[in-house]
Amino acid sequence: MAIHIVEEANRCLGCKRAFCQIKGCPVQTPIPQVIDLFKQRRLEEAGELLFQNNPMSAVCSMVCNHSGQCEGSCVQGRKGTPVHFSSIENYISTAYLDRKEWTPAPSCGKQVAVVGSGPAGITVAIKMAQLGCAVTVFEQRPEIGGVLEYGIPEFRLPRSLVQKYRHVMCSLGVRVRPSTTIGGALHIDDLLRDGYDAVFVGTGTWRARKLGIPGESRGNVLFGIDYLVDPTSVAIGQNVAVIGAGNVAMDVARTALRSGARKVTVYARSRHISAIDDEVELTELDGAEIVCGKAICAIDDNGPVFETAIFDEDNNVVGYEGELDHVAADTIVIAASQVPKDKLVLTTGGLETDHRGLLSVDEHGMTTVPGVFAAGDVVNGPLTVVHAVAGAKLAVEGMTSYLGL
């Protein structure tokens, strides 16, 4: 492992105009600088640089779309193989989390509430704590992590890594209130009443988007985002049909295969697969089949019913064949995107959303309620961890300015 990483680091050209950083990375990770520090055996400094730019660096090293971002932008890849920065980043970042001694920053006298402890919430909690704010995180589930803990499968992201962030936050003085839903017994108005100077909302998108087709409420149907929370609680059966073509659909398919399913088929309406290329390849490698051109129109006791798409020369859907395709399946898992839950919006006066239920924010990450900021999936819809971090960093800048820090 270490030899491979050193070899990869030595392949880096140290480009002055580093496309891996400026073009490939949503959070502008200073990749050439990190690799240079690593090559000089200045591991702690490299880890510090990564962490301060992106507290979720260790997570991103495992779940990012590297081939479509940093590694996909590496100039070495034009005529050969790109530098595998993901391996280098993982080595540095996990070592940094294990070895770093964390201490609380001097108090600045401000209190911040963070609602949700997914990647955006953790990023904001850490950043604001480092500025000396007294931070309290409110998490509706027993464990922190959000999608990191309850969405991304263990085989992609070890839970032990996710829980290291609880240690980091607590060591920085962050208080965590698990199993507490804001929008339930407590509302955002209560937080503002109780002296929090700013509130950050990073509650993600945890409500499955229903398809509105007959049979969606049958007992042989699951929603992907709910299934991934606890796959062991469901008898998935031998033959599984997954509806959708995004990352959640791929995670569902791979999880089902690890849960005893013998045949897993992913059905996509179009020929455009929105999931990360690497995840699609791994899904097929694990044994799932991906079938394009199937638009689900109903579900019966035997399985899904599809219309078969007709494509033009540009692979656009231009119509459907007349005959319906009835497919046998023990379980149908719908993984066709998700939207935010509406409890928080319904209990917060003046908090505006768009037509999808996503929170509206300005260029500083502030919502339509003064002092309440938001970022991540609850603003953008379901994207990747690194995009959540990018939004969280913008919100931190906005909160810092708002608080006069």
Give the label of every model feature segment.
Residues 173-193, 231, 293-296, 302-330:
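A structured beta-alpha segment of the ubiquitous adenosine-cofactor-binding alpha/beta core
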Residues 1-106, 111, 159, 201-217, ...:
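Ferredoxin-type iron-sulfur electron-transfer modules and their immediate structural context
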Residues 134-137, 141-172, 176, 253-297:
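Rossmann-like dinucleotide-binding cores of NAD(P)H-dependent redox enzymes
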Residues 106, 111-115, 163-213, 297-302, ...:
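Feature captures the FAD/FMN-dependent oxidoreductase FAD-binding
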Residues 217-238, 314, 319-382:
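FAD-site-proximal beta/loop scaffold in flavoenzymes
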Residues 89-106, 164-184, 207-259, 353-368:
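Glycine-rich dinucleotide-binding loop and its adjacent helix/turn
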Residues 111-136, 250-257:
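N-terminal Rossmann-like FAD-binding beta1-loop-alpha1 element of flavoenzymes
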Residues 116-119, 245-246, 377:
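Glycine-rich Rossmann-fold phosphate-binding loop(s) that bind the pyrophosphate
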